[in-house]
């Protein structure tokens, strides 16, 4: 996903919100999706491969695909319990 170079800083927030909704919409259609920095860490190569001009900032990459039952895709790393990193105050 890109935004024009002259965009205001708030445009990045809007793009992030849009990308989150796109990921949710993909899930609703049965697609797996994830925002991935690895897809945009080389913006010059992304521009060349995708035909994106220098007037756009390469900001967000989203990987899309259909879920699989392969053992590699089933890998799930150990995670910290959410209560150790999140506090919700009423």
Where are the predicted features?
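Active-site-flanking beta-strand signature of metal-NTP-handling nucleotidyl enzymes
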Residues: 1-2, 62
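Helix-biased detector of long, well-ordered alpha-helical tracts
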Residues: 2-7, 86-90
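Small-aliphatic-rich amphipathic alpha-helix that forms the alpha element of a beta-alpha
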Residues: 4-49
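Short, hinge-like loop/turn segments at secondary-structure boundaries
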Residues: 51-54
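C-terminal helix-cap and adjacent tail motif
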Residues: 58-90
């Amino acid at each position: 996903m890109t935004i024009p170079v002259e965009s205001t800083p708030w445009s990045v927030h809007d793009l992030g919100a849009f990308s989150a909704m796109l990921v949710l919409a993909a899930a609703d259609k049965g697609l797996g999706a994830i925002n991935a920095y690895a897809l945009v860490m080389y913006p010059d190569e992304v521009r060349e491969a995708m035909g994106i001009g220098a007037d756009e900032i390469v900001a967000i990459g989203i990987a899309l695909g259909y879920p699989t039952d392969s053992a590699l895709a089933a890998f799930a790393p150990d995670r910290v319990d959410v209560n150790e990193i999140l506090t919700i105050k009423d």
